[in-house]
């Protein structure tokens, strides 16, 4: 499937531009040629989360911050990674669910709580919990003004003043 996708993408780009060199982000934050991506798709497995870390690193180094903790809050999960001396920590293996493969990736830790995760207090424990239930994009958090009524992480950030109340989210 990756081979077909990359082939189609290259064909469309070639039809629209001249001499384009397609590169695709790898799980370790580096770039793969189109051919390498087709031949070794396992190296792309965690490229999405690696992209957040790579983008944060690009900005941080130019701003003079070579050491940082990156936090990427999505709708249902939050990814955290450590950058030390301008280099993200790497892992030799990548695990998704119950499957582990020998492919390097940025060392990213994920928790199942994102902006749309619903906060609740279960009767059994009486303790505040966040997720795994999610408000989704529609209706979404109450702050979206689209009919969501259950409290989410995004709503808490609006109430705490971390996100502007007046701005359309």
Give residue spans per PLM region.
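N-terminally biased helix-coil "hinge/interface" segments that flank
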Residues: 1-169
């Amino acid at each position: 499937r990756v081979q077909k996708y990359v082939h189609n993408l290259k064909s469309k780009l070639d039809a629209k531009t001249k001499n384009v060199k397609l590169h695709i982000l790898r799980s370790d934050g580096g770039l793969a040629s189109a051919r390498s991506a087709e031949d070794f798709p396992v190296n792309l497995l965690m490229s999405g989360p690696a992209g957040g870390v790579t983008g944060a690193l690009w900005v941080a180094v130019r701003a003079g911050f070579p050491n940082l903790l990156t936090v990427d809050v999505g709708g249902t999960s939050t990814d955290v990674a450590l950058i030390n001396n301008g280099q993200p920590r790497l892992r030799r293996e990548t695990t998704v669910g119950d499957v582990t493969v020998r492919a390097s990736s940025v060392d990213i830790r994920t928790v199942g709580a994102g902006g749309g995760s619903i906060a609740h207090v279960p009767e059994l424990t009486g303790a505040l919990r966040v997720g795994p239930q999610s408000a989704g994009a529609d209706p979404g958090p109450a702050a979206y003004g689209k009919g969501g009524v259950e409290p989410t992480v995004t709503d808490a950030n609006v109430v705490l003043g971390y996100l502007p109340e007046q701005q359309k989210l």
